[in-house]
Amino acid sequence: FPDFGRGEDETLNLLAPYVLGRATRLDSPISFAHMDPPTPWITWAMSLWNARLNQNLLHSASAPFAVEAEKKVIDWLTPFYGMDGGHMCSGSTIANITALWAAREVRGVKKVVASRSAHFSIAKAASLLGLSYEQIPTDVRGRLNLNEIEDMSDACLVLTAGTTDTGAIDPLVLVGQAKWTHVDAAWAGPLRLSLTHAYLLDGITGADSIAVSAHKWLFQPKDSSLIMFRDTELANSGISFGGSYLAAPNVGLQ
């Protein structure tokens, strides 16, 4: 380490050519169809506010408006998916882990079933939670093959709405046929807000939990996602902790 720091201005000038010159430019024409979109300017301002105020959402006393704003966002979005609540997460990997955690705690699932095209975060979640993991072959369109499904009476079935490789949407007619059904809608979830394409996710409202990335088709900075539950009170009962300095329960992996 040097004996003396360079100071903020000199440090920014030193880093600018690297940070700005060597970043992937998502607003470039050659980034067309990239799942991580360019962000609108208003999110830059909000990110500055967030860094400046450094709010802690563990309790309303430490982040009065931020806690209220999160609830308003959840209350606005959940009806599109048939869910009754949830919370924000730092990315859909965390959202998926939270969903499978709730499935284990409140329904006692023993294994996770997903297609071979499911996001690797599902395998991560199963491993972290001590659940067995079964991958189902896909059909010619990259969707979970209906004909390969077996007994799911003790399973959490994970259906993908928008696979990473091809954007395929698993058959949502399978919703409700397992002990717990989670839909990883990180990519295609915002289709529910579309007047013309919401039908592509018909059936999703019967799921027990849904993950949606805000930093994809909702054009928010990374990492930002939502985990939503059909029965939030039930789900939260298995993934909430408190005590000590926390006056309110801490839900999930926040």
Q: Residue spans of the language-model regions?
A:
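PLP-dependent aminotransferase-like
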Residues: 107-154
